[in-house]
């Protein structure tokens, strides 16, 4: 999987998540009653790092490839869902869809558990 397109896409998305996390942190620091943005920022920043780390572990052959990819994509998709919902609530006054943030949070938990399984599962033989 070394240098695969999917890995590069995940890393690129994680970079965008990181940038968005910093933007939301700044908005939270300078905006009135913007606590939701701080939570959105944290989720994006933490899980951008988690996605990059997971890809690195896959590339090194430390964790199961397929399960690790599920975890990495889960980090990206779920953190984006969570942060988008909180940001919409802050600026637009409504949610992305009912239970969007809790759904994103639940998917983040599942992604962390998938990473644990990927680490425990034997490496695939090439």
Residue ranges with predicted function:
Residues 1-126:
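Polytopic transmembrane helical bundles with strong interfacial aromatic enrichment
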């Amino acid at each position: 999987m070394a240098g695969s397109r999917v890995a590069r896409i995940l890393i690129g998305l994680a970079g965008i998540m990181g940038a968005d996390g910093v933007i939301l942190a700044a908005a939270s620091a300078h905006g009135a009653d913007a606590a939701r943005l701080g939570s959105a920022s944290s989720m994006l920043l933490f899980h951008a790092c988690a996605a990059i780390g997971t890809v690195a572990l896959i590339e090194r052959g430390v964790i199961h490839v397929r399960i690790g990819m599920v975890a990495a994509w889960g980090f990206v998709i779920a953190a984006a869902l969570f942060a988008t919902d909180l940001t919409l609530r802050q600026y637009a006054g409504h949610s992305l869809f009912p239970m969007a943030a809790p759904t994103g949070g639940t998917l983040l938990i599942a992604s962390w558990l998938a990473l644990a399984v990927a680490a425990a599962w034997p490496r695939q033989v090439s």
